[in-house]
Amino acid sequence: MLIFEKSRKNRRTLAHAIADKMDANDIPANLLRHDAPRLPELSELEVVRHFTRLSTQNFSIDTHFYPLGSCTMKYNPRAANRLASLPGYLKRHPLSPAPQSQAFLQCLYELQTMLTEITGMEKISLTSMAGAQGEFAGVAMIKAYHESRGDYDRTEMIVPDAAHGTNPASAAMCGFTVKEISTTKDGDIDLEKLRQMAGAKTAGIMLTNPSTLGVFERQISEVAKIIHNAGGLLYYDGANLNAILGKYRPGDMGFDVMHLNLHKTFATPHGGGGPGAGPVAAGPRLSKFLPVPMVGKNKEGYDWLTEKECPKSIGRLSAFMGNSGVLLRAYIYLRLLGKEGLSRVAEFSTLNANYLMKRLEQLGFTLAFPNRRASHEFIITLKPLTRAYGVTALDIAKRLLDYGFHAPTIYFPLLVPECLLIEPTETESKQTLDHFIEAMEKILTEIKTTPDLLRNAPHQQLINRLDEVKAARELDLRWYPIAKETEIFIQ
């Protein structure tokens, strides 16, 4: 039931003093209301119960296993939230002078230092407010680099066919023409096609490594050589950095610039539309183009580095210093784990993914790349089951909800038909993985015996299967409900 439908006239949430009546003549006539505001009227208890009930109907990391591939839905330690909310940080005004913000600036400076070491880059800017914005900034830096050299003919950006959708979008927003490079049957970049494609118009290539196919790009050194010899640069999409923390650094692979998704790799909160953070790191060729502000250190302490100190910067991407609360959470996460802890993140995320992959293969599910070891995630294709029983990846995703699991990513990457992209993360126990395997085994039996059970799933949720075509074509969106075929507000 909607909160508007629970409304009853003259119910109030809080008792408060009645404000002094203002003479209506003091207010311009065009600003006066003619009708009561269309807001629900409920008691405080009714409001609390309503939103608490809604929260229990959500799937979240705090309540369910959430193997959403390419999203790294790991547990966010509560200690980071608690420490980042200390009054000294929480109540600091963005315009506070640097001498009064030394502790805050020290945290950001040390975060910069740790992230440059983790990535193998020269410098980093923390100001981007999301991974997509950081990605845009990195591509803009590549453009600024070529233009600073008078190389205006480099108008093409190479993007793999398995890339995240933000990759071609960022390239297009920066004015580049996107050139798609295909992937081989083993999940690697097609080097022969890359050699043919790279040339005088190539500005760079955008890669995720490990890729969204769940495998490591084994020929990355050769890819870097081909692009650099053609005069281009390498952009690293940090979406899958979790798999290689402390093991292999993007800078050592030959990448020139990258962004990091703090909400994935460094356990800051997901969802809700933000706040987020997508720091941008760069090697020697591009570090002078990083967005400002950054934090510097001198003999007097810590201070902001702005356009004055960084004249080649592409400029500002956000007001003040981006989402500093998110940055503090990532800083605390890194301090809690330390260098050895970060290496264990990569080890356990890879171990969990490979365990899950092998167990599902043993049950009879088809792996997209059966001859490859998984990185931190893997793909199964349901095409054989679709052909035999008419059950789709969407059907399995819906049925998993009935077993108490959030569905994996479905239909991505696009080049693998009827696929599930599964990422268990390092924070899940073997017992949780085994429960998921049991659910998948039961679903596999249902596919072969009662496929209609899946086609109509979910069966145990508040909202069952929707008519997705109708929902997309016949939108019915409003901020308040109305009675059918009338404009009468539900009261």
Swiss-Prot record:
Pfam families per the UniProt record, alphabetical: GcvP2_C, GDC-P
Reaction equation(s) it catalyzes: N(6)-[(R)-lipoyl]-L-lysyl-[glycine-cleavage complex H protein] + glycine + H(+) = N(6)-[(R)-S(8)-aminomethyldihydrolipoyl]-L-lysyl-[glycine-cleavage complex H protein] + CO2
Disulfide bonds: none
EC identifiers of the protein: 1.4.4.2
GO cellular component, one term: glycine cleavage complex
Modified residues (N6-(pyridoxal phosphate)lysine): K264
CDD domains, A to Z: GDC-P (cd00613)
Keyword Electron transport: no
Key words, A-Z: Oxidoreductase, Pyridoxal phosphate
Biological function: The glycine cleavage system catalyzes the degradation of glycine. The P protein binds the alpha-amino group of glycine through its pyridoxal phosphate cofactor; CO(2) is released and the remaining methylamine moiety is then transferred to the lipoamide cofactor of the H protein.
Family label: Belongs to the GcvP family. C-terminal subunit subfamily.
Protein name stated in the entry: Probable glycine dehydrogenase (decarboxylating) subunit 2
